[in-house]
Amino acid sequence: MRHRKSGRQLNRNSSHRQAMFRNMACSIVRHEIIKTTVAKAKELRRVVEPLITLAKVDSVANRRLAFARTRDAEVVGKLFTELGPRFQERPGGYTRILKCGLRAGDKAPMAYIELVGRPEAAEAVDVEAAE
C-alpha cells in the first residue's frame, strides 16, 4: 500500500528521478522557463520553490545547502544574486505552470513552468529535447 507516500515515481528509480529533477531545477533557474510534461512540472515545483526560499537569505551556509542540492556554482550564483532579491517580498508561489497542449510523439500533456515575474525576453527551453 502506498498510503501517505508523497511525490510521483514517474517510472524511474530514485537516483534517476533525483538527477532528473536536479537538472531540471538548474535549467529553470538558468532559463526561467522550460517546457516539460505536466506531471514533471508539478513535481518540479517541490524542488525549485524551497531553493528560491533558501536564496532569500544570503549566507555561506545557505549557499552551501543550495550547492549541495544543485551541484552547479553558476546556478547558485544566480539564485542568490538575482532570484533571492527578486522574490524577497513574495511569501511563496514563485513558479507558474501553463498547459500547452499535447506532445506530438505520444500525446503526453505538456506544460511550460516559469518563474513568476520573469523578464519577457526569456525564451522557453525544451527540456524533453535535452534529455
Curated annotation (Swiss-Prot):
Protein name, as recorded: Large ribosomal subunit protein bL17
Quaternary context: Part of the 50S ribosomal subunit. Contacts protein L32.
Record key words, sorted: Ribonucleoprotein, Ribosomal protein
Gene: rplQ
GO cellular component term of the entry, any: cytosolic large ribosomal subunit
A GO molecular-function annotation: structural constituent of ribosome
Single biological process term from Gene Ontology: translation
Family listed: Belongs to the bacterial ribosomal protein bL17 family.
Source species, domain of life: Bacteria
Keyword Ribosomal protein belongs to the record: yes
Xref: PROSITE patterns: RIBOSOMAL_L17 (PS01167)
A Pfam family of this chain: Ribosomal_L17
Coiled-coil ranges from the UniProt annotation: none
NCBIfam families xrefs: L17
UniProt entry tagged with the keyword Ribonucleoprotein: yes
